[in-house]
């Protein structure tokens, strides 16, 4: 049962189990998983989930739809789970649900950890700092939560991660400058200034 799971939000949302991409279903079902990944290992109330996913939308049985999406995600994430059992990933916890994942299984969490490690190394070991920050930046496959760019629940998390991405690039540039690589950085710095003129 199970296997190694990777949850990727630094680009289009996807989940990889033992090297194979998991079919996460319809957009709203994927949106539910994306929402839960913004704060994993925390109980989300059903009311908070419904408000986040559906907002003020009228005309649907949102409680029933949520149950259908939870069921669909459970099947997708744990296909070997016995019927009518909860499994170990998407758990029912009063007053709602909890996504139980190892933090390092989420690319955004790994990214944050690597950025902190890289920044801490800049002054003492700029070579190692550049390497670690490069590893962090390599986790990005597009814009954070790319397929949910227009959904209200994702906006603050997208902004937070994109800001951290820019900080990581700046920190890697600082490390590379300390390594004496100023010539190699000219085109990258010009591109950064064009993309972020107010930074």
Question: What do the predicted segments below correspond to?
Answer:
Residues 1-199:
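Intrinsically disordered, low-complexity protein-interaction/activation regions
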């Amino acid at each position: 049962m199970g296997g190694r799971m990777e949850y990727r939000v630094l680009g289009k949302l996807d989940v990889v189990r033992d090297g194979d991409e998991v079919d996460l279903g319809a957009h709203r079902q994927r949106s539910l998983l994306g929402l839960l990944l913004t704060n994993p290992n925390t109980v989300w109330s059903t009311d908070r989930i419904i408000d986040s996913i559906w907002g003020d939308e009228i005309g649907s049985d949102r409680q029933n739809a949520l149950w259908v999406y939870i069921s669909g995600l459970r099947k997708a994430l744990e296909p070997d789970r016995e019927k009518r059992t909860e499994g170990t990933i998407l758990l029912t916890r009063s007053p709602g649900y909890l996504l139980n994942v190892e933090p390092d299984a989420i690319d955004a969490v790994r990214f944050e950890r690597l950025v902190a490690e890289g920044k801490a190394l800049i002054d003492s070991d700029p070579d190692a700092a550049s390497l670690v920050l490069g590893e962090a930046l390599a986790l990005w496959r597009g814009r954070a939560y790319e397929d949910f760019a227009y959904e209200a629940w994702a906006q603050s998390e997208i902004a937070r991660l994109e800001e951290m991405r820019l900080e990581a690039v700046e920190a890697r540039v600082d490390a590379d400058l300390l390594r004496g690589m100023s010539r190699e950085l000219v085109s990258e710095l010009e591109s950064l200034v064009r993309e972020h003129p107010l930074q």
